[in-house]
Every structure is written in structure tokens, then in C-alpha cells.
């Protein structure tokens, strides 16, 4: 998936006057491509001489150029002992020596995912359109919260089916998602493919439904929420970083592999609100230093990792009032609306507003020992 290759090229005496350009030939020699690895050219502009406002070498601007070179390689998933399927008291269990996945046939959701009696995911995914209100949402908050009730979702089960094949079990769940007393919503289809090797592929398709005339001008986000083991506090991700990024606020971020704690991924605003989002994430891992959960996306998604829920952010008036959750809260977004500047300026641009729309997202989760995640994330499979 991703690898950071650092090549520093310093040019002395290469002067470019304002409004002009100059061609510089970079002394990059040929190198062997690694399979399933992305390459980027990172250009950094630094302060040449010390000034009152910045020391020499201070980074002024960074630009990242994706290199259109890639070597793809595909593998066949290994197989393990046959998956067993049992059902009782509204719980469907798929398991073998490498994986245990439990589903609620009543509530139409994944209850847990793990192995050897240890839960890596403790709930999810469930669809979500809500984010804790930001300052720039101040003129939308009344409609969102008291007219469309986006903070009060309802997801009803329509069907659950299970199909056993040679080395995998496919669980399909259909739901209807909406918010209290609304005529709009989404017909959702969740397909969980549990492989005997211990991986589980999750495919989610949503079809927008409008049975009336009223709907929000735009939604804060379209995505899903999952919950992870509360002890998985060490995070690594391949996506934009190192700080938070949003669709209209990412000039300071570049693609790379980054590490932090879950708490460290929070942007601690004076007034609690949505924060810590990362755009264009290809994979992430959370772990306890030994065991971890690896999640690989088929297409780039937005990511939030936190030790608190959106509801606790919305409720708190000060950072010390934010209530801790019992799990690691995982947001994966198909799209999240931009930030705009509507507390004192303009709304988000139209292209940065998430409208009621069809969507599709897919990702694969698996247990991965800490230290193996980059190697595991690079693997691509034939199916």
C-alpha cells in the first residue's frame, strides 16, 4: 500500500525571481519497485536564512506529487480449517481456529469480530450521517438537530441470509436507515464475507430513498461507525497526515504512513466539536503493542479514531467534560462535508457538501500482530 522513501535534494544558488520559473533536473537514479507500493515525490520549500519570524530551514510549504509508477502483485488467500456456522437466541456465529464473527439476526448487525476469545471489533458497522456540530455549522444546527434529527438514527432489519462455500461464509444483511420521523433515508445492503484464513471483507451499498419532499440541504457525512477493543490505543494509518484534514482543509497534509495514540489523534479545541478526521485513508491499524486490528480499504475513505462518541462531544462545553467511551470509536466515511467558514463567512462550496445520495464502500478487517501491518496491508488478493 504505502511506503515513505525519503530523498533529500538541496539546491544552493538556484534563484527564481517572483512570477518566473526554472527547470531543475532531479538526480534520481533508477530503483527497483516494490510490489503494491505507492511512490510520491515530496517537494519542500524551506526558509534559507534566519529571520525574526522563523529560523533557517523552517518549512514554509510542502507539495506532494504522486508518481505514476506501480508494480501490482496478487496472491491467493491461504485456507485454514473449515468455518463452522451456528445460530441460536438471535445470534449467528461463524468461526474456526483463526476467526470468530458474531451477527445479530434481530438487530441486523455485526456484534463482534476477533479470534482466540479476544474481541478486536466490539460492534459495527452501522450507518451514520451525524457529526458533532462544529462552529461553522452554527446556522445549520437547528435544522439538523431539531427538524431532521440527524443525531437520532434508526436502522431497521429487513433480512439476514447466510451462504456457506468451500473456504468462506457470506452473511448478507439488509436494513433501512433513517432518522426520527423522516421521509428520507437509505436502503442498505451489508455483505460480510468471512474467510477461513481469518479475514472478513465488508461491502456496504446504500441507495438513497425520498418518500416526501423535505430533506436536509446537505448532510454532515455519509459513513459508518464501528467500535474497537478499548485496549487498542496505538494507531497507525496510511493516508493524509500528520494532522487532521478535511476535504476543504488539507493543504498542510500529505499522504504517508503515520503513527499516534488514539488520544493523540484528537485536535483539542477549546470548545468540543468534530475533530481529528483524516482524508484519503487506504488502511489503518489499532493495537495494544502486541495484537492489533488491520482494516484495508478498497477505495480511500475518511477516518476518525477516538475514545469518545460524537454525542459526548456535542454534550460537553469544555474539554474536561468529554465523557470517555468504553470502546475505541471508529468512523469510516464515504464522504464528510467540508468545514467552510460559516461562523463568520461563507458556507462550504457546493462540491464540498454531502447531499442525499447513493453510496458504496468496502474494506477488509483482520487480526494482525503489531509490526506486521505494513507487510499485510500491501497484500492484494485475486478475488
Language-model features, listed with the residues they occupy:
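Beta-strand/loop-rich accessory regions of lumenal/periplasmic or secreted enzymes
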Residues: 15, 27-36, 49-51, 65-383
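Intrinsically disordered, low-complexity Pro/Gly/Ser/Thr-rich segments with frequent PxxP/GP/PP motifs
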Residues: 2-58
Amino acid at each position: 500500500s504505502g511506503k515513505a522513501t525519503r530523498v533529500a535534494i538541496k539546491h544552493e544558488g538556484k534563484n527564481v525571481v517572483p512570477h518566473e520559473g526554472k527547470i531543475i533536473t532531479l538526480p534520481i537514479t533508477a530503483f527497483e519497485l516494490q510490489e503494491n507500493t505507492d511512490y510520491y515525490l515530496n517537494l519542500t520549500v524551506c526558509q534559507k536564512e534566519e529571520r525574526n519570524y522563523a529560523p533557517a530551514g523552517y518549512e514554509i510549504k510542502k507539495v506532494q506529487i504522486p508518481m505514476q509508477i506501480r508494480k501490482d502483485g496478487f496472491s491467493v488467500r491461504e485456507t485454514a480449517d473449515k468455518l463452522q456456522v451456528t445460530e441460536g437466541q438471535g445470534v449467528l456465529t461463524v468461526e474456526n481456529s483463526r476467526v470468530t464473527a458474531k451477527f445479530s439476526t434481530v438487530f441486523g448487525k455485526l456484534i463482534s469480530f476477533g479470534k482466540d476469545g479476544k474481541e478486536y471489533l466490539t460492534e459495527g458497522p452501522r450507518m451514520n450521517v451525524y457529526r458533532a456540530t462544529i462552529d461553522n455549522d452554527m446556522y445549520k444546527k437547528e435544522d439538523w438537530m431539531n427538524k431532521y434529527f440527524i443525531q437520532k438514527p434508526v436502522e431497521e432489519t429487513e433480512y439476514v441470509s447466510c451462504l456457506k462455500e468451500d473456504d468462506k461464509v457470506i452473511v448478507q444483511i439488509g436494513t433501512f436507515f433513517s432518522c426520527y420521523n423522516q421521509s428520507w433515508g437509505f436502503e442498505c445492503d451489508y455483505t460480510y464475507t468471512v474467510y477461513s484464513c481469518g479475514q472478513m471483507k465488508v461491502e456496504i451499498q446504500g441507495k438513497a430513498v425520498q418518500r416526501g419532499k423535505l430533506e436536509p440541504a446537505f448532510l454532515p457525512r455519509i459513513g459508518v461507525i464501528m467500535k474497537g477493543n478499548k485496549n487498542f490505543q496505538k494507531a497507525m494509518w496510511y493516508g493524509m497526515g500528520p494532522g487532521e484534514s478535511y476535504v476543504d482543509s488539507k493543504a498542510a497534509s500529505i499522504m504517508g504512513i503515520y503513527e499516534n495514540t488514539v488520544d493523540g489523534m484528537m485536535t483539542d479545541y477549546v470548545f468540543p466539536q468534530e475533530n481529528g478526521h483524516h482524508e484519503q485513508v487506504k488502511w489503518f491499524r489499532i493495537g495494544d503493542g502486541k495484537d492489533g486490528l488491520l482494516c484495508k480499504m478498497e477505495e480511500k475513505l475518511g477516518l476518525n479514531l477516538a475514545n469518545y462518541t460524537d454525542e459526548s462531544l456535542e454534550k460537553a462545553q469544555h474539554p474536561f467534560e468529554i465523557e470517555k467511551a468504553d470502546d475505541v470509536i471508529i468512523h469510516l466515511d464515504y464522504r464528510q462535508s467540508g468545514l467552510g467558514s460559516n461562523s463568520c463567512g461563507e458556507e462550504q462550496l457546493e462540491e464540498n457538501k454531502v447531499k442525499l445520495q447513493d453510496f458504496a464502500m468496502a474494506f477488509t478487517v483482520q487480526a494482525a500482530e503489531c509490526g506486521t501491518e505494513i507487510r499485510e496491508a500491501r497484500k492484494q488478493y485475486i478475488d
